[in-house]
Amino acid sequence: MSKAEMVANKIKERFPNAEVVVKTNKWGRERVWVRISREEYKELMKFIRELDPEAHYSIGIEQDWGDELGFLNHILLFYDEPPGVSLLIDVHAPKDNPVLPDTSDIFPISLQFEREGMEMVGLDFEGAPDKRRLFLPDDFPEGIYPLRTDEKGVPEEMVKNAGHPYLLRREKK
């Protein structure tokens, strides 16, 4: 049994409602993909720390899935014993209640990615110790989220042509 399969099995045992799949990428590396409910998300993150106290939180990525907002975490486990285990944890929240639990008390670096998710798609990480904007200026309008694909995304009148050569329209003289 590979380390990835071992991690997947332990997650399945502890979280029977989670969707857990081991996939092999085109380079032959195994990845463990987990889809977890927001109610069990924080407990899963604590469990990951139990499995590997040195687990490395790589990145969190916010996503707009139509009716839901998602947050995809990449964590590397057992990296000091090659090959490490690449773990991807996907959690979703409905757009009408986009609340997920903060996990920065477990993985402190996750806070910067949570802050990005708050300002870019409108996720709310309940209990986050710092909810200040990370990238957007203070005068950017509240309730508009640059990576949303619905009516809360950037309206057309805010979009300006920054001069990209493929988008410029030249006037004919």
UniProtKB/Swiss-Prot annotation:
Tell me the temperature dependence. Optimum temperature is 90 degrees Celsius for membrane-bound enzyme but 80 degrees Celsius for the purified enzyme. Membrane-bound enzyme has a half-life of 2h at 100 degrees Celsius whereas the half-life of the purified enzyme is 30 minutes at 100 degrees Celsius.
Question: Is the keyword Iron assigned to this protein?
Answer: no
Q: How is its activity regulated?
A: Inhibited by 0.1 mM Cu(2+).
The cellular location(s) given in this protein's UniProt record come to: Cell membrane
Signal peptide start and end residues: none
Question: Per the entry, which co-factors are needed?
Answer: Ni(2+)
Substrates-to-products reaction catalysed? H2 + 2 oxidized [2Fe-2S]-[ferredoxin] = 2 reduced [2Fe-2S]-[ferredoxin] + 2 H(+)
Q: Look up the record and report any one GO term of the cellular component aspect.
A: ferredoxin hydrogenase complex
Entry EC no(s): 1.12.7.2
Disulfide linkage: none
Tell me one GO molecular function of this protein.
Answer: ferredoxin hydrogenase activity
By sequence similarity, the record places it as follows: Belongs to the complex I 30 kDa subunit family.
**Protein's name according to its UniProt entry:** Membrane-bound hydrogenase subunit beta
Lineage of the species this protein comes from: Archaea, Methanobacteriati, Methanobacteriota, Thermococci, Thermococcales
